[in-house]
Amino acid sequence: MLTDLQLPVGARITPAFTLTIKNKVLEENISARIISLSVTDNSGFTADTLNLTFDDSDGQLQMPVRGTVLHLHLGWSKQALYDCGYFTVDTVTHSGSPDKIGVVARSADFRGSFDNKISQSYDDYTLGAIVRIISSRNKLDLPVIPQELDSVKIPHIDQTSETDSYFLTRLAQRYGAQVTVKNGAILFFKAGTGRTSSGQAIPWKTIVRSDGDNHNYQMVDKKAYDGVKAQWHDLKTATTSSVALKRSPAEGKEAQPASYIAGSGTNVLELGKIFPDEETAKRAADSVFNQIQNDAATFSIRLALGRADLSAQSPVNVQGFKDVIDSQRWVIDSALHEINEKGFTTKLILKPYVADITYQSSILQL
């Protein structure tokens, strides 16, 4: 159960928020006009989104200007509010009757330099150095990237008529990471590991069935691959070799017999591309297999009492469902927080936690 939601005994449970526009807290009479508010915290390069609907039935509201920066804090009355970050107004609508103003704001403004196509070659850089070059080019704050990714050596890679957003996404996919832009900085991190973008462990949460009013579990048929094979060619020796990474149980743990995503022990996916060296081949195999595991199952649940402190990449255990669901460890892929006439709820979409998956590596010269 989510026992760290500390609400006063006997108190009226009331959602609360503050919305700051241009460093000024939204006036109370305007806040009272908000019909609905929702904020989606996403993983990956999909920007977090803030949706607001205002009552303009008397025609007295001014429509906000695109590019305006909003800052949201969300939670419950008489409790510390959670900082949901900064959002840039992207879309404004007016509809009726009765008249309403709709506002969509996003955590990153991709309308500027991120949309420009760039051609550049990177020779003998680290992954972190490339990310910092892109960050500087787009006039962002210093990026946040854990040391294990920052130090990855890249002998050569080309950005050929690609936007920086597309190129960053390609880099993330190649090295088993995710990338996003939040609060003016690029975050480049390992997905599904329950860690912050800087590599710090996020505390585990436990959700029991009574915390939610509906849920859905889905197992996707990915042939339950339990390994990935990649080949590389050494130009100096003119030899081609392959590396196979096969899943093995984490140390000290037994494989879950009910798991749908562990693999059968015989299904190995072979990558068609020939890589330039062993390290690149290993990283490619690791990245692809982690993605297969991450996509193998999805579990969603709507919490009856909203939890603004639950965000993407937080690790979660669940209890009170089927064994195959409870035995799987999860990480939050996205969190949708909503305030409307029904109250404050949070919908979570969970993906498998992959940090405790270990591999057996075997190398074969072809």
Predicted regions and their residues:
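Short beta-strand-centered interaction patches in the first periplasmic/extracellular domains
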Residues: 2-3, 7, 100, 106-109, ...
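Beta-strand-connecting loop/turn residues
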Residues: 48, 99, 184-185, 342
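Conserved "cap/hinge" positions at secondary-structure junctions
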Residues: 74-76, 190, 320
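Amphipathic, non-transmembrane alpha-helical segments in extracytoplasmic/periplasmic proteins
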Residues: 51-53, 105, 119-143, 158-182, ...
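An acidic/polar, Gly/Ser/Thr-rich interaction patch typically located in mid-to-C-terminal regions
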Residues: 33, 37-65, 211-366
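Short acidic, glycine/proline-rich loop/turn micro-motifs
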Residues: 114-118
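Short, compositionally biased
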Residues: 86-95, 120, 157, 193-195, ...
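Assembly/oligomerization scaffold segments
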Residues: 1-112
